Amino acid sequence: MAATRVRCCHSNAAFTRLPLTRHRNSPTLPISLNRVDFPTLKKLSLPIGDGSSIRKVSGSGSRNIVRAVLEEKKTEAITEVDEKGITCVMKFGGSSVASAERMKEVADLILTFPEESPVIVLSAMGKTTNNLLLAGEKAVSCGVSNASEIEELSIIKELHIRTVKELNIDPSVILTYLEELEQLLKGIAMMKELTLRTRDYLVSFGECLSTRIFAAYLNTIGVKARQYDAFEIGFITTDDFTNGDILEATYPAVAKRLYDDWMHDPAVPIVTGFLGKGWKTGAVTTLGRGGSDLTATTIGKALGLKEIQVWKDVDGVLTCDPTIYKRATPVPYLTFDEAAELAYFGAQVLHPQSMRPAREGEIPVRVKNSYNPKAPGTIITKTRDMTKSILTSIVLKRNVTMLDIASTRMLGQVGFLAKVFSIFEELGISVDVVATSEVSISLTLDPSKLWSRELIQQELDHVVEELEKIAVVNLLKGRAIISLIGNVQHSSLILERAFHVLYTKGVNVQMISQGASKVNISFIVNEAEAEGCVQALHKSFFESGDLSELLIQPRLGNGSPVRTLQVEN
């Protein structure tokens, strides 16, 4: 049956009614210039505008999906009309699928939620990404004849072949990929270089292998599953290899592929995390370390799902890194802004960009522990009750380089800051924290954007060389950023307590910055002193009974408290 297209004479809106696969009595779509109402579909209404078209597509059984397609912007919003069909995303990290036994446990965990029909996003098996990178670096200098003998290649092969055998699945699902991996390493050895583009293709083998193994295992235990490579189902990124940004065209492409496959042949989608495809080159790209979280939230937004679950090896987001301080405790609630700041300033639980799709789609993110699924975890939403806690977490970012840039020409000069930051833009270096005065700028550089020890030094030398053309530059290595995340609108009292703690430890704060989002305050200190600072701050902010006084003290007209907070030595 051909589709019928009707154009409304009062606007540019075009409406397409597609033939329905199961429901013959399709409701008439009452058209207005601003909204389209679906009275028989649980009173669902979708706003539209000029240049929009509305399509109603029915799925299998009683399930319906409504799609509002914005033709001009090439974006698509999808709303579930009833509770059946794909319901949530479950993302599992590398430690959660590090062995055959762990994969069995993850499969059992998924089956404990029979009411859910999830999309599963997987990382590479534990330590595989690191081994792939090491193998690539060794291949550059080992020679073609020795590429097959690289230790990390043998470790990768042994792990995946052993896992396949223990899960009792056909080894052919991975053998082709292991052979292709070996040939790639020989190619790197022949060329004697590992470009960013090749590096991304190399590390993609980790997720491609883990998802194929897990999908095959689910099928052997009677759970119908289908494997997907993210770069083949519509994950479109910039061509910034090793750190691609997901483009808006990803959302309708991913939604169409996953929903179309589900409607024709329902099966649990098993999707590679971390990967995409460059929009110009068509080459495999990666989303940066921890990018599987971003894959999960992108799918959640694309499909308009009710929840995104990120399963880790810790009981949710913690008040600090438990390897620094063992008395760290789970944070029950976070806002998207707080979670984004936590991730950006060093918390390893989430990818820095992963909150953006969830925030835009207003989809809750639940961080859970795959080793301890009964733990409540952390729920991340748009807002939370700010009266429940002042701070949510203390984050440490190590290996930070600090730059002091001073110039009397900066005083009253228009465009000086633009010149400084254009240098970083040209060199592709990200800046973390910035503080300015009349004649100087202090800033820190993001270490995650610097590749190796050799490149770090080369890039830093180049930065200093360029900056010295316009200012006096002092480069300070071995620094760390300590960030206090939470409701920092009470910043004066938080600073009072924090500085008292650092003063009693004899620590000199070299720089301080407060984010415009009002959810973080950051201090720069010597890295050697950083862990002790985190421990002392945690004791003061999370283990002191008088912290709640910050919330209940009467305030003066300027917002200041009537009395200062008593701090124990």
UniProtKB/Swiss-Prot annotation:
One of its GO terms (cellular component) is chloroplast stroma. Residues 1-90 form a transit peptide. It holds the Pfam family AA_kinase. Its main location: plastid. Substrate binds at residue 207. The keyword Hydrolase does not apply. GO terms for molecular function: aspartate kinase activity; ATP binding. Residues 405-483, 484-560 form the ACT domain. Its EC number is 2.7.2.4. Inhibited by S-adenosyl-L-methionine (SAM) and lysine in a synergistic manner. No inhibition by threonine, leucine or SAM alone, and no activation or inhibition by alanine, cysteine, isoleucine, serine, valine, methionine, glutamine, asparagine, glutamic acid or arginine. Pathway: Amino-acid biosynthesis; L-lysine biosynthesis via DAP pathway; (S)-tetrahydrodipicolinate from L-aspartate: step 1/4; Amino-acid biosynthesis; L-methionine biosynthesis via de novo pathway; L-homoserine from L-aspartate: step 1/3; Amino-acid biosynthesis; L-threonine biosynthesis; L-threonine from L-aspartate: step 1/5. S-adenosyl-L-methionine binds at residues 430, 452-453. It is found in: Plastid, Chloroplast. ATP binds at residues 91, 94, 123. The keyword Ubl conjugation does not apply. One of its GO terms (biological process) is amino acid biosynthetic process. Keywords: Amino-acid biosynthesis, ATP-binding, Chloroplast, Kinase, Nucleotide-binding, Plastid, Repeat, Threonine biosynthesis, Transferase, Transit peptide. InterPro entries: AceGlu_kinase-like_sf, ACT-like_dom_sf, ACT_Aspartokinase, ACT_dom, AK-LysC-like, AK1_ACT_1, AK1_ACT_2, Asp/Glu/Uridylate_kinase. It comes from the Eukaryota. CDD domains: AAK_AK-LysC-like (cd04244), ACT_AK1-AT_1 (cd04933), ACT_AK1-AT_2 (cd04918). Homodimer. Belongs to the aspartokinase family. Involved in the first step of essential amino acids lysine, threonine, methionine and isoleucine synthesis via the aspartate-family pathway. Only one ACT domain (ACT1) is implicated in effector binding. This is Aspartokinase 1, chloroplastic. It comes from Arabidopsis thaliana (Mouse-ear cress). The gene is AK1.
